[in-house]
Amino acid sequence: MSTVYVVGLGPGAGEQMTVRAEKILEACPVILGYTVYIDLVREQYPEKKFLSTPMKQEVKRCQMAFEEAVKGQDVAMVCSGDAGVYGMAGLIYEVGREYPEIKIEIIPGITAATGGAAVLGAPLMHDFAVISLSDLLTPWEQIEERLEAAAKAGFVICLYNCLLYT
């Protein structure tokens, strides 16, 4: 049985990738992901088969991963940060319903929120909120409500996808 691994690469620097992520990338003959994330690992694994798609083709990317796995190959789907925090883990599980013969395994990584907090010297020691500013899947009005509620409650707020709004 082939496996699709969803691998969190961490917040961008190679040394922030987990040992488990490195082992999975080393073991899988196929590495697939968003073009920018593939560029982060291509040089380190030159013998691998690389497949990529641009932004906004996440479903297609997941389908490609399963199509490769159906051929009998283990596949590493790479994401930035942690695969389960604004990553591809949820979508892989959704698309994976169509491929019950393929195993799915999530390989967590260091989130951008915790990585950024460490760089800034601002550890997330108490309750905090993580909110994406992307309105691709969430209406902007709902994002605003979440921001207001988190601020009113006194949470430290870690924002994702800020570049969309600068």
Give a label for each model feature.
Residues 160-161:
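Internal catalytic or translocation cores that form aromatic/hydrophobic pockets or channels
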